[in-house]
A protein has these predicted regions:
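Cofactor-binding beta-sheet edge motifs in enzyme active sites
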Residues: 1-368
Length: 368
């Protein structure tokens, strides 16, 4: 659903019903906007719809409260889809630069990682490498003022999608340069038993057999950490080289998230992350021209369809000796990387920009 809010002002008290992920932040924003004591502002969040980061800010709630105070009557504000694209925040554009080296036996010898404007969530190196540096430029995942021409905000696992895509793509490039299987290469450089466990579990469930990339099988692997949760995903894709299109056929995802309070809910979150991840990996992109937003509805801003959904297998590993960790975002962070690595395995072409649109895939195929 789009952003919506209903506001009612009664004397020096305000009640606002809003679709928001941040009710206390909304309360404070509304109080400042209409000059009320925050203790006299009540925000009610109906149990409906989803946010995925987009409902973090509260412009529609502030707008409704201002109007209600002005006219002296309850006011409802509901954005159209076009207004949603225009007024809402965007996931920040980012650039990642990586320099890395391997020794004579293929071992990682150094790692120099710089991320600009995506923040450092997901950037720390968890592979064993003797010489490494990770630097994040910009303020958090929004960058310093003036970094972006439009408002930026959270998008499910803010920044980690970008950082995991960059790191896991580079790890696959290093494995290929070393002449080693990408799963075996990762295991060779992992010392954390939690990550080793999820990767081995995913590979076993998938039925992975070692092969140097590109094996032409269309298999990809990626690992990540988010919100204290360890995740490893393996995917199989088919690429139409002529059209530059990708069909994700199968995804196996193993996740270790401490003690799991609601296993069915955790499984559904993993599946939702995988499906949603198809979008940022393959199609979701906003185009601008002369300060104008060209994509204002789903006719040009393509999100995943039911017909895109692959066979999905999820494995939740028990870790009852550890406290509960995040379950709503980790599985999405690896989707860009696992699909990119599968495309490279299928075709030998490496796509280094998200989303991996048909034009970008064909360009990568053309350049080899």
């Amino acid at each position: 659903e789009t952003h919506a809010a209903v506001a009612r002002i009664e004397g020096d008290k305000a009640t606002v019903w809003a679709s928001t992920q941040n009710p206390f932040g909304a309360r404070d924003e509304i109080a400042r906007a209409i000059g009320f004591d925050p203790r006299n502002v009540r925000v009610i969040t109906p149990f409906v719809g989803g946010g995925f980061g987009g409902k973090t800010f509260n412009l529609q709630a502030v707008e409704a409260a201002r109007l209600a105070k002005s006219v002296g009557r309850p006011v409802q504000v509901m954005w159209s889809r076009e207004e949603e694209f225009f007024h809402d925040t965007f996931r920040p554009a980012a650039i990642v630069k990586i320099k890395s080296g391997i020794g004579t036996a293929g071992e990682m010898t150094f790692w120099d990682y710089e991320v600009f404007y995506a923040g450092d969530r997901g950037a720390p190196q968890f592979y064993t490498v003797p010489n490494h540096r990770t630097a994040s430029h910009g303020s958090g995942w929004q960058g310093p003022p003036g970094s972006h021409p439009f408002g930026t905000g959270a998008w499910r696992a803010p920044g980690n999608n970008t950082n995991t895509f960059a790191r896991e793509s580079q790890i696959d490039l290093m494995a290929a340069a070393a002449g080693l299987d990408p799963v075996e290469y990762r295991l060779k450089h992992l010392s954390d038993p939690r990550m080793v466990r999820v990767l081995k579990t995913a590979a076993e469930r998938f039925g992975w057999t070692p092969a140097k990339a590109p094996s032409r099988r269309g298999y990809g692997v990626a690992c990540g950490i988010d919100a204290g949760t360890y995740v490893a995903t393996i995917a199989e894709v088919a690429v139409d080289a002529g059209k530059g299109t990708v069909q994700v056929k199968r995804v196996v995802c193993a996740q270790e998230m401490g003690v799991v309070i609601n296993p069915q809910g955790a499984k559904l979150q993993m599946e939702g992350c995988i499906v949603m991840g198809l979008g940022y990996a393959l199609t979701e992109e906003i185009h601008f021209q002369g300060g104008r937003i060209l994509d204002t509805n789903y006719d040009t801003y393509r999100i995943p369809r039911f017909s895109w959904v692959p066979t999905i297998e999820t494995i939740i590993l028990e870790a009852n000796d550890l406290p509960p960790q995040g379950g709503g975002e980790p599985a999405i962070v690896v989707m860009g990387a696992v699909i990119a690595n599968a495309i490279a395995d299928a075709t030998g072409a490496r796509v280094l920009q998200l989303p991996m649109t048909p034009d970008r895939i064909k360009a990568a195929l053309h350049t080899g």
